[in-house]
C-alpha cells in the first residue's frame, strides 16, 4: 500500500473506492494498491 497526495489508476482493473473519506485504489495487482493522504 502506497500513500500519495494524488492517486492514479495504473491499469484498467484498478478500482477507486471511498471509505470514511479515505480514497483508495484496489486492484488484483498488489503493487497498484494506493491510498490518498
From Swiss-Prot:
GO MF: structural constituent of ribosome
Domain of life: Eukaryota
Keywords assigned by UniProt, alphabetized: Plastid, Ribonucleoprotein, Ribosomal protein
PROSITE patterns with a match to the protein in the record: RIBOSOMAL_L36
One GO location term (cellular component): ribonucleoprotein complex
Gene Ontology biological process: translation
Subcellular location(s) of the protein: Plastid
A Pfam family matched in the record: Ribosomal_L36
Family: Belongs to the bacterial ribosomal protein bL36 family.
The protein, known as: Large ribosomal subunit protein bL36c
Native source species: Helicosporidium sp. subsp. Simulium jonesii (Green alga)
Amino acid at each position: 500500500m502506497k500513500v500519495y497526495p494524488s492517486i492514479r489508476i495504473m491499469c484498467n482493473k484498478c478500482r477507486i473506492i471511498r471509505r470514511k473519506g479515505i480514497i483508495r485504489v484496489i486492484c488484483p495487482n498488489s503493487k497498484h494498491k494506493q491510498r490518498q493522504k
